[in-house]
Amino acid sequence: MSDRRTFLKKTSLAGLAGLLPMTSLLDGNFDAPSVLNKDSETTWADGSRLVVSVSMQFEAGGQPDNAESPFPQNMQKGFIDLPGASWYDYGYKEGIPRMLDNWDALGIKVTSHMVGSAVLKNPKLAKEIVDRGHEAAAHGMNWSSQYNMPYETEKKFIKDGVDAIKKVTGFTAVGYNANWLRRGTNTLEILQELGFTYHIDDLSRDEPFLIKVKGKDFAVVPYTLRCNDIVLVEGKNFSADQFVRQVKMEFDQLYSESERKRRQMSISFHDRIGGTPQMVSATKEIISYIQEHKGVSFKRKDEIAQLAYADKSIIRE
């Protein structure tokens, strides 16, 4: 993931914008669209008041040599960053197994975005994720950027990742997440052609919606940077307590809004970050807090996409 630190710095600035009072956004000529008066049309079809979507990124093992890590990026060419590699190894040796046990203890199912090469390197772990009832979604074959790939090259890149997941787990991925969300102008057409039903590379809403791709409906299940460990913990150096506080504040606001409109909350964890002892403890506190509230359901992203397709009141763009 090249330029990761630059990306994280930029998202830090974007996060500050989210702390501005809403009145500051409305002082000019900006007209905020409102659907608050459409109570009966914007609830979840299954009766949920608020739906929470948890992501577990399975990337470790698929990273390139000398990928960015917490260590200084000053390795000379021709040498291997051994401690950096061990940081990634933690993701599949300790991180995902610990998170899987935590999901079981909490009684929730998540969506795991799997890098194809990581799956092939750790097939037993990938299969265990699916065997425990979680969704396997595609995340490319490796950490390459795909936005600049020619059509057929990108199609093969995506399909190779899907095939790896299918071969190892028996699960056919229907959801997609590009490297750093950076899809290209051809990506959605390719996904539709390959049989995908949704993608998550969009930050524009706090609820799912449908778009048209070559005249056919395609679901968008929005992702998050605000409740994302790679942005907050690795990027902004949040402590576990700060992470808990921010995610709880996000939930409280969305839960309040969900009394009047359809709301989705997304939380994202990465194998080598979200799977550390303190972060799993923080996650347990967050999920337990959310579960204390009536009307909240936890759903895999493929389930959310299916609800979107079946809902006549879903937003269409």
Please tell me what each predicted stretch does.
Residues M1-L8:
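Twin-arginine (Tat) signal peptide motif
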Residues L8-D27:
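N-terminal export signals
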Residues V35, Y198, L210, K248-E317:
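C-terminal domain-boundary segment and adjacent tail
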Residues S34-W87:
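N-terminal regions that are enriched for targeting/export leaders
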Residues V52-V54, A136, S297:
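Residue-level marker for buried hydrophobic side chains located in beta-strands
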Residues D31-D46, K159, D163-R260, I315:
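Active-site-adjacent pocket scaffolds in enzyme catalytic domains
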Residues M149-F157, F238-Q242, Q278, A282:
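Alpha-helix N-cap and loop-to-helix initiation/capping positions
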Residues G78-I80, P97, D104-T185, P208, ...:
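Metal-dependent polysaccharide deacetylase catalytic core of the NodB/CE4 family, i.e.
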